[in-house]
Amino acid sequence: MLTTRPRGTNDILPGEVEKWQFLEQLTRQVCREYGYGEIRTPIFEHTELFARGVGETTDIVEKEMYTFTDRGDRSITLRPEGTASTVRAYVENKLHALPQPVKLYYTGPMFRYDRPQAGRYRQFHQFGVEVFGSNDPAIDAEVIAMAMDIYHRIGLQNLKLHINSVGCPECRPVLRQRLQEYFKPHLSNLCSNCQGRYERNPLRILDCKSEKCQEIGQSAPTTLDVLCPECNSHFESVKTYLDAVGVSYIIDNRLVRGLDYYTRTAFEIMTQDIGAQSSIGGGGRYNGLIEECGGPATPGIGFALGLERILLTAERQGITFPITRGPQVYIATVGSGIERQAFALLQDLRRQGIAAEKDYLGRSLKAQMKFAGKLDTRFVVILGEEEFDRGVAVVRDMQAGEQQEVSLRELVLFIKART
């Protein structure tokens, strides 16, 4: 049926979209305070970008991407996440020539063929940040603190920050060998996905959601068991910086996240309010990704927050947003001979920065007043031919329940003085 939206998508309607606008404004304000500039990348990219950037063995690339061949016989994919596109833009536009670090943020829709459920859609929205050009553990702490700052400004409670270090190319081979040794006796009992991961990337077995695989891997070696001295020192410094700014965390040595590009710091923010241990955001460091995508060796770190999941968590916690609804002024006309003058007044109010509306259905004055009340309008300006000829209008303050005549010349000042 063509008149229904595709499964896993959602219409954000008036009355609901204001919450989104508040959230977007809040994140932009935080970005200004932290020194991040906005970047906007295409919604679709060449498929190879995600295969190389996200990782060919990830669930995203293997099962969840919306991929198609365009009329030029090119393989194109709707972006499933924002980091790979931002890295591509950094490399292609030679942003490495700018003073480093380069700090960017983005907001927009992402696409994954996933099983729709509460707070999880096939088209979903993310806010994310990326920092390129610094290996300083203080930057890791900054992006983590920034994510928590956003959640706290929204008013979210009962969040748990999980952090880990997933090592680097120096210490990963040791972990790979130990994991393969550990899982080898259990290989036939692992799920089919993890049997494939055993050879390609056994670290991903720790990320499996299968209860059987989780049970088997309960005593498996972890990244913290094999960190090289440099990675261990880096992780200790990240914790020190988080301690310095009062950010509480849980060391989770089983946290590896679902993307192959992470190195060293990985983190996730969890809540119980939208399901057991559900993630509402996370990120980490990816020091080899820019080089993998054709750029110079450049360290990077970032995070992404799921906007639908944030709004669902806020709803479950009873958080309300400061939303302004309806016009400040509604012009109610008396008689058909005043419509042209009312329309001119309407446009003048708008040019003065006042949100204003009028009737376009020929309603009676009583019906217009009732409609203005439904719009949650503060002032109703009642304009008739007699009042207009005298250069006045009757202004009713719907909040105070009072009305008075006001000169049309002073109408803007009258309204602005009371709002």
Curated annotation (Swiss-Prot):
The keyword Ligase applies. One of its GO terms (cellular component) is cytoplasm. SUPFAM superfamilies: Class II aaRS ABD-related, Class II aaRS and biotin synthetases. Its main location: cytoplasm. It catalyses: tRNA(His) + L-histidine + ATP = L-histidyl-tRNA(His) + AMP + diphosphate + H(+). One of its GO terms (biological process) is histidyl-tRNA aminoacylation. It is an enzyme of class 6 (ligase). It comes from the Bacteria. PROSITE patterns: AA_TRNA_LIGASE_II. Signal peptide: none annotated. The keyword Secreted does not apply. It is found in: Cytoplasm. InterPro entries: aa-tRNA-synth_II, aa-tRNA-synth_II/BPL/LPL, Anticodon-bd, Anticodon-bd_dom_sf, His-tRNA-ligase, HisRS-like_core, HisRS/HisZ, HisRS_anticodon. Its EC number is 6.1.1.21. Keywords: Aminoacyl-tRNA synthetase, ATP-binding, Cytoplasm, Ligase, Nucleotide-binding, Protein biosynthesis. One of its GO terms (molecular function) is catalytic activity, acting on a protein. Homodimer. Belongs to the class-II aminoacyl-tRNA synthetase family. This is Histidine--tRNA ligase.
